[in-house]
Amino acid sequence: MVRTKTWTLKKHFVGYPTNSDFELKTAELPPLKNGEVLLEALFLTVDPYMRVAAKRLKEGDTMMGQQVAKVVESKNVALPKGTIVLASPGWTTHSISDGKDLEKLLTEWPDTIPLSLALGTVGMPGLTAYFGLLEICGVKGGETVMVNAAAGAVGSVVGQIAKLKGCKVVGAVGSDEKVAYLQKLGFDVVFNYKTVESLEETLKKASPDGYDCYFDNVGGEFSNTVIGQMKKFGRIAICGAISTYNRTGPLPPGPPPEIVIYQELRMEAFVVYRWQGDARQKALKDLLKWVLEGKIQYKEYIIEGFENMPAAFMGMLKGDNLGKTIVKA
Protein backbone atom coordinates (compact mmCIF):
# COMPACT_ATOMS: atom_id res chain seq x y z
CA MET A 1 0.00 0.00 0.00
CA VAL A 2 1.15 3.51 -0.84
CA ARG A 3 0.66 6.33 1.61
CA THR A 4 -0.07 9.78 0.23
CA LYS A 5 0.24 13.16 1.89
CA THR A 6 -2.32 15.82 1.01
CA TRP A 7 -2.73 19.48 1.93
CA THR A 8 -6.39 20.36 2.48
CA LEU A 9 -8.26 23.61 3.04
CA LYS A 10 -9.02 23.49 6.76
CA LYS A 11 -10.93 26.77 6.70
CA HIS A 12 -11.67 29.41 4.10
CA PHE A 13 -9.25 32.32 3.88
CA VAL A 14 -10.02 35.68 5.45
CA GLY A 15 -7.55 38.21 4.10
CA TYR A 16 -4.10 36.72 3.56
CA PRO A 17 -3.97 32.93 4.04
CA THR A 18 -2.29 31.70 7.21
CA ASN A 19 -0.79 28.37 8.23
CA SER A 20 -3.87 27.57 10.29
CA ASP A 21 -5.99 27.61 7.12
CA PHE A 22 -4.33 24.40 5.90
CA GLU A 23 -4.18 20.85 7.21
CA LEU A 24 -1.79 18.08 6.17
CA LYS A 25 -3.45 14.68 5.97
CA THR A 26 -2.08 11.21 5.30
CA ALA A 27 -4.01 8.34 3.73
CA GLU A 28 -3.46 4.95 2.14
CA LEU A 29 -4.28 4.56 -1.54
CA PRO A 30 -6.11 1.45 -2.78
CA PRO A 31 -4.54 -1.04 -5.22
CA LEU A 32 -4.66 -0.07 -8.89
CA LYS A 33 -7.51 -1.24 -11.09
CA ASN A 34 -7.05 -2.10 -14.76
CA GLY A 35 -6.43 1.06 -16.78
CA GLU A 36 -5.14 3.04 -13.82
CA VAL A 37 -1.73 4.47 -12.96
CA LEU A 38 -0.10 5.54 -9.71
CA LEU A 39 1.49 8.98 -9.88
CA GLU A 40 4.24 10.43 -7.71
CA ALA A 41 4.60 14.21 -7.69
CA LEU A 42 7.98 15.58 -8.78
CA PHE A 43 7.18 19.30 -8.95
CA LEU A 44 4.09 21.21 -7.84
CA THR A 45 2.95 24.72 -8.63
CA VAL A 46 1.36 27.51 -6.61
CA ASP A 47 -0.38 30.28 -8.56
CA PRO A 48 -2.37 33.44 -7.75
CA TYR A 49 -5.64 32.03 -9.12
CA MET A 50 -5.70 29.52 -6.25
CA ARG A 51 -6.47 32.32 -3.79
CA VAL A 52 -9.77 33.01 -5.56
CA ALA A 53 -10.54 29.46 -6.67
CA ALA A 54 -10.28 28.23 -3.07
CA LYS A 55 -13.58 30.00 -2.39
CA ARG A 56 -15.28 27.27 -4.42
CA LEU A 57 -13.79 24.49 -2.30
CA LYS A 58 -15.49 23.02 0.72
CA GLU A 59 -13.54 23.00 3.96
CA GLY A 60 -11.64 19.72 4.04
CA ASP A 61 -11.16 19.57 0.26
CA THR A 62 -7.72 19.11 -1.28
CA MET A 63 -6.11 22.35 -2.47
CA MET A 64 -6.21 22.50 -6.26
CA GLY A 65 -3.26 22.68 -8.63
CA GLN A 66 -1.11 21.12 -11.30
CA GLN A 67 1.99 19.01 -10.87
CA VAL A 68 4.62 17.30 -12.97
CA ALA A 69 4.36 13.67 -11.94
CA LYS A 70 5.96 10.33 -12.71
CA VAL A 71 4.10 7.09 -13.30
CA VAL A 72 5.54 4.77 -10.64
CA GLU A 73 3.11 1.88 -11.16
CA SER A 74 0.92 1.19 -14.16
CA LYS A 75 -1.97 -0.96 -15.29
CA ASN A 76 -2.45 1.23 -18.38
CA VAL A 77 -0.52 0.23 -21.52
CA ALA A 78 -0.62 3.81 -22.83
CA LEU A 79 1.16 5.10 -19.71
CA PRO A 80 3.99 2.73 -18.79
CA LYS A 81 6.02 3.06 -15.61
CA GLY A 82 8.44 5.99 -15.86
CA THR A 83 6.20 8.19 -18.04
CA ILE A 84 6.29 11.89 -17.10
CA VAL A 85 2.93 13.66 -17.19
CA LEU A 86 1.13 16.84 -16.25
CA ALA A 87 -1.60 16.08 -13.73
CA SER A 88 -4.06 18.08 -11.65
CA PRO A 89 -4.76 16.10 -8.49
CA GLY A 90 -4.01 19.10 -6.29
CA TRP A 91 -1.56 19.41 -3.43
CA THR A 92 -0.83 15.71 -2.99
CA THR A 93 2.28 13.54 -3.17
CA HIS A 94 0.67 10.46 -4.74
CA SER A 95 -2.53 9.95 -6.68
CA ILE A 96 -4.33 7.43 -8.86
CA SER A 97 -5.59 8.29 -12.35
CA ASP A 98 -7.32 6.47 -15.18
CA GLY A 99 -5.13 8.48 -17.54
CA LYS A 100 -7.92 10.46 -19.20
CA ASP A 101 -7.04 13.66 -17.37
CA LEU A 102 -3.28 13.38 -17.88
CA GLU A 103 -1.15 15.16 -20.45
CA LYS A 104 2.24 13.97 -21.63
CA LEU A 105 4.96 16.56 -22.09
CA LEU A 106 5.81 17.65 -25.63
CA THR A 107 7.62 14.85 -27.46
CA GLU A 108 10.41 17.29 -28.35
CA TRP A 109 11.05 18.21 -24.69
CA PRO A 110 14.86 18.09 -24.30
CA ASP A 111 16.95 17.00 -21.34
CA THR A 112 18.59 20.43 -21.27
CA ILE A 113 15.66 22.21 -19.59
CA PRO A 114 13.98 21.28 -16.30
CA LEU A 115 10.71 19.36 -16.24
CA SER A 116 9.35 22.01 -13.87
CA LEU A 117 9.20 24.43 -16.80
CA ALA A 118 6.01 22.60 -17.83
CA LEU A 119 4.41 24.38 -14.85
CA GLY A 120 5.83 27.76 -15.84
CA THR A 121 7.17 29.26 -19.05
CA VAL A 122 6.22 26.24 -21.17
CA GLY A 123 3.02 25.63 -19.25
CA MET A 124 -0.06 27.42 -17.98
CA PRO A 125 1.65 30.75 -17.07
CA GLY A 126 3.49 30.90 -20.41
CA LEU A 127 0.29 30.09 -22.29
CA THR A 128 -1.50 32.82 -20.35
CA ALA A 129 1.10 35.36 -21.45
CA TYR A 130 1.05 34.07 -25.04
CA PHE A 131 -2.69 34.17 -25.61
CA GLY A 132 -3.34 37.28 -23.55
CA LEU A 133 -0.77 39.28 -25.47
CA LEU A 134 -1.17 37.85 -28.97
CA GLU A 135 -4.90 37.04 -29.04
CA ILE A 136 -6.55 39.41 -26.56
CA CYS A 137 -4.26 42.42 -27.05
CA GLY A 138 -3.23 41.49 -30.60
CA VAL A 139 0.03 43.41 -30.30
CA LYS A 140 1.90 44.64 -33.36
CA GLY A 141 5.47 45.84 -33.81
CA GLY A 142 6.03 49.43 -32.74
CA GLU A 143 3.31 49.43 -30.09
CA THR A 144 3.84 50.14 -26.39
CA VAL A 145 2.93 47.46 -23.86
CA MET A 146 2.47 47.95 -20.12
CA VAL A 147 2.58 44.92 -17.81
CA ASN A 148 2.45 44.77 -14.01
CA ALA A 149 3.61 41.96 -11.73
CA ALA A 150 6.17 41.93 -14.51
CA ALA A 151 8.77 39.70 -12.85
CA GLY A 152 6.28 36.93 -12.13
CA ALA A 153 5.63 33.73 -14.04
CA VAL A 154 3.20 35.40 -16.45
CA GLY A 155 4.46 38.98 -16.56
CA SER A 156 8.06 38.15 -17.41
CA VAL A 157 6.93 36.09 -20.40
CA VAL A 158 4.52 38.83 -21.52
CA GLY A 159 7.36 41.33 -21.68
CA GLN A 160 9.71 39.00 -23.53
CA ILE A 161 7.13 37.99 -26.14
CA ALA A 162 6.28 41.66 -26.64
CA LYS A 163 9.96 42.40 -27.28
CA LEU A 164 10.09 39.51 -29.76
CA LYS A 165 7.21 41.15 -31.61
CA GLY A 166 8.99 44.51 -31.79
CA CYS A 167 7.14 46.36 -29.03
CA LYS A 168 8.30 48.83 -26.43
CA VAL A 169 7.75 47.26 -22.99
CA VAL A 170 7.19 49.01 -19.67
CA GLY A 171 7.08 46.82 -16.56
CA ALA A 172 6.10 47.44 -12.95
CA VAL A 173 7.50 45.31 -10.12
CA GLY A 174 7.73 45.39 -6.33
CA SER A 175 11.47 45.33 -5.60
CA ASP A 176 14.75 46.74 -6.89
CA GLU A 177 16.04 43.19 -7.39
CA LYS A 178 13.17 42.56 -9.78
CA VAL A 179 13.88 45.83 -11.59
CA ALA A 180 17.46 44.70 -12.24
CA TYR A 181 16.29 41.28 -13.45
CA LEU A 182 13.86 42.71 -16.01
CA GLN A 183 16.43 45.19 -17.24
CA LYS A 184 18.65 42.20 -18.04
CA LEU A 185 15.75 40.64 -19.94
CA GLY A 186 15.54 43.68 -22.19
CA PHE A 187 12.49 45.53 -20.87
CA ASP A 188 12.70 49.14 -22.07
CA VAL A 189 11.53 50.72 -18.81
CA VAL A 190 11.10 49.03 -15.42
CA PHE A 191 10.16 50.66 -12.13
CA ASN A 192 9.50 49.67 -8.53
CA TYR A 193 5.94 50.82 -7.90
CA LYS A 194 6.53 50.73 -4.13
CA THR A 195 9.20 53.44 -4.23
CA VAL A 196 8.07 55.86 -6.96
CA GLU A 197 6.60 59.13 -5.72
CA SER A 198 3.81 59.16 -8.30
CA LEU A 199 2.63 56.18 -10.34
CA GLU A 200 0.85 58.51 -12.75
CA GLU A 201 3.96 60.60 -13.43
CA THR A 202 6.18 57.52 -13.69
CA LEU A 203 3.89 56.03 -16.33
CA LYS A 204 3.80 59.31 -18.26
CA LYS A 205 7.57 59.57 -18.22
CA ALA A 206 7.96 55.96 -19.37
CA SER A 207 5.65 56.49 -22.35
CA PRO A 208 4.53 60.10 -22.89
CA ASP A 209 2.30 59.06 -25.80
CA GLY A 210 0.43 56.49 -23.71
CA TYR A 211 -0.06 52.74 -24.02
CA ASP A 212 -1.48 50.56 -26.79
CA CYS A 213 -1.78 47.40 -24.72
CA TYR A 214 -2.10 46.91 -20.98
CA PHE A 215 -1.64 43.37 -19.65
CA ASP A 216 -3.22 43.55 -16.21
CA ASN A 217 -2.24 41.09 -13.48
CA VAL A 218 -2.96 43.38 -10.54
CA GLY A 219 -6.27 45.27 -10.84
CA GLY A 220 -7.37 47.87 -8.30
CA GLU A 221 -6.15 51.46 -8.12
CA PHE A 222 -3.03 50.61 -10.11
CA SER A 223 -5.13 49.64 -13.12
CA ASN A 224 -7.30 52.74 -12.88
CA THR A 225 -4.14 54.83 -13.20
CA VAL A 226 -2.85 52.90 -16.22
CA ILE A 227 -6.22 52.96 -17.97
CA GLY A 228 -6.18 56.75 -17.70
CA GLN A 229 -3.11 56.72 -19.98
CA MET A 230 -4.28 54.35 -22.69
CA LYS A 231 -4.10 55.44 -26.31
CA LYS A 232 -7.17 55.69 -28.50
CA PHE A 233 -8.46 52.17 -29.28
CA GLY A 234 -6.16 50.72 -26.61
CA ARG A 235 -6.60 47.09 -25.60
CA ILE A 236 -6.60 45.79 -22.04
CA ALA A 237 -6.12 42.09 -21.29
CA ILE A 238 -7.48 41.40 -17.81
CA CYS A 239 -5.57 38.38 -16.58
CA GLY A 240 -5.69 38.79 -12.81
CA ALA A 241 -6.33 41.16 -9.93
CA ILE A 242 -3.88 40.04 -7.28
CA SER A 243 -4.05 43.38 -5.45
CA THR A 244 -7.68 42.64 -4.55
CA TYR A 245 -7.57 38.92 -3.73
CA ASN A 246 -6.79 39.32 -0.03
CA ARG A 247 -8.95 42.36 0.65
CA THR A 248 -11.43 42.17 3.49
CA GLY A 249 -12.95 45.61 2.84
CA PRO A 250 -14.82 46.97 -0.19
CA LEU A 251 -13.22 46.82 -3.60
CA PRO A 252 -11.92 50.06 -5.15
CA PRO A 253 -14.06 51.72 -7.83
CA GLY A 254 -13.44 50.84 -11.46
CA PRO A 255 -11.82 53.07 -14.10
CA PRO A 256 -13.47 56.37 -15.09
CA PRO A 257 -16.21 55.50 -17.62
CA GLU A 258 -15.52 58.61 -19.71
CA ILE A 259 -11.96 57.45 -20.39
CA VAL A 260 -13.06 53.98 -21.43
CA ILE A 261 -15.80 55.41 -23.66
CA TYR A 262 -14.07 58.35 -25.33
CA GLN A 263 -10.78 56.53 -25.81
CA GLU A 264 -12.84 53.64 -27.20
CA LEU A 265 -10.91 51.12 -25.15
CA ARG A 266 -11.45 47.39 -25.39
CA MET A 267 -11.22 45.51 -22.09
CA GLU A 268 -11.43 41.73 -22.12
CA ALA A 269 -10.96 39.29 -19.28
CA PHE A 270 -9.80 35.80 -20.12
CA VAL A 271 -8.93 32.39 -18.72
CA VAL A 272 -6.21 30.47 -20.52
CA TYR A 273 -8.22 27.25 -20.80
CA ARG A 274 -10.28 28.91 -23.56
CA TRP A 275 -7.57 27.80 -26.00
CA GLN A 276 -7.33 24.05 -26.52
CA GLY A 277 -6.36 21.57 -29.23
CA ASP A 278 -4.15 22.75 -32.07
CA ALA A 279 -3.96 26.36 -30.82
CA ARG A 280 -2.65 25.23 -27.45
CA GLN A 281 -0.15 22.80 -28.95
CA LYS A 282 1.20 25.46 -31.33
CA ALA A 283 1.60 27.89 -28.44
CA LEU A 284 3.48 25.32 -26.33
CA LYS A 285 5.80 24.53 -29.23
CA ASP A 286 6.42 28.24 -29.85
CA LEU A 287 7.25 28.79 -26.19
CA LEU A 288 9.58 25.79 -26.06
CA LYS A 289 11.30 26.91 -29.27
CA TRP A 290 11.85 30.44 -27.92
CA VAL A 291 13.28 29.05 -24.68
CA LEU A 292 15.67 26.74 -26.54
CA GLU A 293 16.75 29.59 -28.82
CA GLY A 294 17.43 31.80 -25.80
CA LYS A 295 14.79 34.31 -26.89
CA ILE A 296 12.81 33.77 -23.69
CA GLN A 297 14.73 33.55 -20.43
CA TYR A 298 13.22 32.01 -17.32
CA LYS A 299 13.83 32.05 -13.61
CA GLU A 300 12.40 29.61 -11.10
CA TYR A 301 11.94 30.16 -7.37
CA ILE A 302 12.36 26.59 -6.11
CA ILE A 303 11.19 25.61 -2.63
CA GLU A 304 12.24 22.17 -1.43
CA GLY A 305 9.80 19.89 0.34
CA PHE A 306 6.11 19.08 -0.04
CA GLU A 307 5.57 20.14 3.56
CA ASN A 308 6.29 23.72 2.46
CA MET A 309 3.36 24.03 0.03
CA PRO A 310 1.42 26.53 2.21
CA ALA A 311 4.54 28.64 2.82
CA ALA A 312 5.28 28.69 -0.91
CA PHE A 313 1.71 29.74 -1.67
CA MET A 314 1.62 32.50 0.93
CA GLY A 315 5.03 33.80 -0.11
CA MET A 316 3.98 33.93 -3.75
CA LEU A 317 0.89 35.99 -2.87
CA LYS A 318 3.14 38.48 -1.05
CA GLY A 319 5.59 38.70 -3.95
CA ASP A 320 8.51 36.96 -2.26
CA ASN A 321 9.32 35.08 -5.47
CA LEU A 322 11.45 36.23 -8.38
CA GLY A 323 10.17 34.11 -11.26
CA LYS A 324 7.89 31.09 -11.06
CA THR A 325 7.33 29.56 -7.64
CA ILE A 326 7.80 25.78 -7.79
CA VAL A 327 7.74 23.25 -4.97
CA LYS A 328 10.04 20.27 -5.42
CA ALA A 329 8.35 17.33 -3.72
From Swiss-Prot:
The modification N6-(2-hydroxyisobutyryl)lysine is found at K178. The modification Phosphoserine is found at S20. InterPro entries: ADH-like_C, ADH_N_2, GroES-like_sf, MDR_fam, NAD(P)-bd_dom_sf, PKS_ER, PTGR1. Keywords: Acetylation, Cytoplasm, Fatty acid metabolism, Hydroxylation, Lipid metabolism, NADP, Oxidoreductase, Phosphoprotein, Prostaglandin metabolism. High expression in the kidney, liver, and intestine but not in leukocytes. The modification Phosphothreonine is found at T18. GO terms for molecular function: 13-lipoxin reductase activity; 15-oxoprostaglandin 13-oxidase [NAD(P)+] activity; 2-alkenal reductase (NADPH) activity; leukotriene B4 12-hydroxy dehydrogenase activity. SUPFAM superfamilies: GroES-like (SSF50129), NAD(P)-binding Rossmann-fold domains (SSF51735). NADP(+) binds at residues 152-155, 178, 193, 217, 239-245, 270-272, 321. The modification N6-acetyllysine is found at K178. It is found in: Cytoplasm. It comes from the Eukaryota. It catalyses: 13,14-dihydro-15-oxo-prostaglandin E1 + NADP(+) = 15-oxoprostaglandin E1 + NADPH + H(+); 13,14-dihydro-15-oxo-prostaglandin E2 + NADP(+) = 15-oxoprostaglandin E2 + NADPH + H(+); 13,14-dihydro-15-oxo-prostaglandin F1alpha + NADP(+) = 15-oxoprostaglandin F1alpha + NADPH + H(+); 13,14-dihydro-15-oxo-PGF2alpha + NADP(+) = 15-oxoprostaglandin F2alpha + NADPH + H(+). Coiled coil: none annotated. Monomer or homodimer. Belongs to the NADP-dependent oxidoreductase L4BD family. This is Prostaglandin reductase 1. It comes from Homo sapiens (Human). The lineage of its organism: Eukaryota, Metazoa, Chordata, Craniata, Vertebrata.
